[in-house]
């Protein structure tokens, strides 16, 4: 039994920690065997040292209990963003109150040139092309590069002249679009008329049995004509023998 007046004191564990690692000292109470009730270890064994490394986590792992709706929402958001990036958009235009506004920023300036408001995006895009050619030159990117030779040229680089030429190009683009729509409507109308006339056609030859009638007439023409006797010397009724009609 241990002496209460002289208790055995064991070395306490010393723990040093830092943000990257921690050192833990584990005491060994005896030199192999356990201490007796009346003796103390005068030369205790060296203390064992165990070094452990602490890792700091700087991100949160995804929760395994995340609902399927949250995952679907994230996937839909990514899809919408990629779809918006892939959709073709004309340069220099934006939609406002159901109409399309066209404007361009002057090179090396913070000011913008207002080019007008148009009912269709194609008209606004054509207006931007004219202004871009006037301010940036022929190497600039255009909405309709095929129409480069047909665009009007502003008299000068002033905002008023550029706006006037842009409006003319937009009007031409709008008229061309309207002509295409009218042509399509006419083609559809002609097609509908032809289809209706085809549906109302009546084959009269088939209705009157014309092929059979013609065949009967051909057969009749191949029949030999009836035999006729010698005519009487006198056409008077007295000299007639009563057999002036055909006899078969």
Curated annotation (Swiss-Prot):
Disulphide bridges: none
Database matches in PROSITE patterns: AP2_ERF (PS51032)
Pfam family for this entry, one: AP2
Residues covered by region (Disordered): 225-248
A GO BP annotation: ethylene-activated signaling pathway
InterPro entries attached to this UniProt entry: AP2/ERF_dom, AP2/ERF_dom_sf, DNA-bd_dom_sf, DRE1A-I
Compartment(s) where it occurs, according to its Swiss-Prot or TrEMBL record: Nucleus
DNA-binding region: 89-145
Top-level lineage group: Eukaryota
SUPFAM superfamilies in UniProt: DNA-binding domain
Regions annotated as coiled coil: none
Assigned keywords, A-Z: Activator, DNA-binding, Ethylene signaling pathway, Nucleus, Transcription, Transcription regulation
Transmembrane parts of this sequence: none
Family under the similarity heading: Belongs to the AP2/ERF transcription factor family. ERF subfamily.
Physiological role: Probably acts as a transcriptional activator. Binds to the GCC-box pathogenesis-related promoter element. May be involved in the regulation of gene expression by stress factors and by components of stress signal transduction pathways.
Name of the featured protein: Ethylene-responsive transcription factor ERF026
Organism name: Arabidopsis thaliana
């Amino acid at each position: 039994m241990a002496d209460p007046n002289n208790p055995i004191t064991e070395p306490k564990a010393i723990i040093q920690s830092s943000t990257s690692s921690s050192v833990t000292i584990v005491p060994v109470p005896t030199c192999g065997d356990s201490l007796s009730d009346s003796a103390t270890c005068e030369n205790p064994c060296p203390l064992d040292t165990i070094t452990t490394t602490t890792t700091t986590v700087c991100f949160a792992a995804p929760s395994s209990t995340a609902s399927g709706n949250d995952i679907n929402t994230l996937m839909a958001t990514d899809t919408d963003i990629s779809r918006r990036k892939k959709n073709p958009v004309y340069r220099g235009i934006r939609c406002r109150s159901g109409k399309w506004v066209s404007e361009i920023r002057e090179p090396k300036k913070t000011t913008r040139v207002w080019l007008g408001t148009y009912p269709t995006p194609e008209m606004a895009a054509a207006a931007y092309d004219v202004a871009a050619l006037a301010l940036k030159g022929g190497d600039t990117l255009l909405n309709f590069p095929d129409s480069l030779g047909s665009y009007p040229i502003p008299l000068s680089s002033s905002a008023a002249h550029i706006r006037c030429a842009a409006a003319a190009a937009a009007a031409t683009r709008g008229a061309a679009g309207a002509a295409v729509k009218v042509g399509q409507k006419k083609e559809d109308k002609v097609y509908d008329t032809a289809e209706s006339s085809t549906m109302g056609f009546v084959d009269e030859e088939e209705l009157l049995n014309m092929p059979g009638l013609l065949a009967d007439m051909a057969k009749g023409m191949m029949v030999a004509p009836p035999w006729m006797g010698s005519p009487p010397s006198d056409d008077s009724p007295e000299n007639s023998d009563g057999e002036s009609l055909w006899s078969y």
